[in-house]
Regions:
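Conserved class I S-adenosyl-L-methionine
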Residues: 1-40, 48-52, 56, 74-77, 141-170, ...
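Short glycine-centered segments of the SAM/dcSAM-binding site in methyltransferase folds
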Residues: 38, 138-139
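Class I SAM-dependent methyltransferase SAM/SAH-binding core
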Residues: 40, 46-99
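A short acidic, Gly/Pro-enriched loop at the edge of an enzyme's catalytic core
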Residues: 102-111
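A short glycine-rich, Lys/Arg-flanked "PGG" loop and its adjoining helix->strand segment in the class I
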Residues: 124-136
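Short alpha-helix
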Residues: 186-199
Length: 200
C-alpha cells in the first residue's frame, strides 16, 4: 500500500497467538538447534521466535543469533525484549530478506524463517542466497500459513470479496492504494512449488 511505511509495521499481536507459537515451536524442534552455533532468525519480528530459539538451545552462551527484520519498529520491540539478556549474543539487523546476503557476510549453521516467506517476491533468489550462506550441512527451516491449498476451495470467493472490500475501505478512508510491484509477492506457491525451489 502507498503511504505504508514498513519500517513502522510489525506483527506483534499475531505473533503472540497460541497456535502461532505452537506451530513455530514444532518447526524449531524439527530443526534441532543444539548443533548450531550461528543462527539467523529471518523475519524476527518482535523477538518471539528468537525467544523460542533460546529456550530450545542447551547452552545459549555458545551461540550467536542474527535477528533480521525489515521493520525498524519490530527490531525495536525485539531489542526491548532482550535488553536484560547478557548471556547470549544477538545481532539485530534491519534488512529485507532479499538483501540478507549483503548484510550477513559470514556463513551460518541454521536459518529459521517463520511465516513470512510468502511476502518475498523473488523467492528463488532468496532461497539461493540462504543456501549459499549456510555452512556445509547447514539447515534451513521455514514455514508459511499462506500457500496454494492452505484455504478450502469453497472459501476462495469469500477471500477475494473480503480483499476487494478491504482495498476499497483503505482507499476511501485512508487514501491508500496497492503498490503494483508488491502484488507478485502475494502469489501463493504450493508445497510442491516450494520443494522445487529448494531442490534447485
Amino acid at each position: 500500500m502507498k503511504n505504508n511505511d514498513s519500517d513502522n509495521f510489525n506483527f506483534d499481536s499475531f505473533s503472540n497467538l497460541d497456535w502461532y507459537k505452537s506451530v513455530n515451536s514444532n518447526l524449531l524442534d524439527l530443526a534441532d538447534l543444539n548443533s548450531s552455533n550461528k543462527i539467523i532468525d529471518l523475519g524476527c519480528g518482535n523477538g518471539g521466535i528468537t525467544e523460542m530459539i533460546l529456550s530450545k538451545v542447551k547452552d545459549v552462551s555458545s551461540i550467536v543469533i542474527f535477528a533480521v527484520d525489515s521493520s525498524s519498529s519490530a527490531i525495536s520491540l525485539a531489542l526491548k525484549r532482550f535488553s536484560n539478556r547478557k548471556d547470549v549474543i544477538i545481532n539485530y539487523i534491519q534488512s529485507e530478506a532479499q538483501n540478507l546476503h549483503e548484510n550477513i557476510k559470514e556463513k551460518v549453521d541454521t536459518v529459521i524463517y517463520c511465516n513470512s516467506i510468502h511476502y518475498v517476491e523473488e523467492k528463488e533468489k532468496v532461497l539461493q542466497h540462504i543456501g549459499n550462506g549456510l555452512e556445509r550441512g547447514g539447515k534451513f527451516a521455514f514455514n508459511t500459513s499462506f500457500f496454494d491449498g492452505s484455504h478450502p476451495k469453497e472459501t476462495e470467493a469469500f477471500l477475494r470479496k473480503w480483499m476487494l472490500k478491504s482495498l476499497r475501505l483503505l482507499r476511501s478512508e485512508y487514501n491508500l492504494k496497492p503498490v503494483k510491484n508488491k502484488v507478485q509477492s502475494r502469489i501463493q506457491l504450493s508445497p510442491e512449488n516450494y520443494e522445487e525451489l529448494l531442490l534447485k
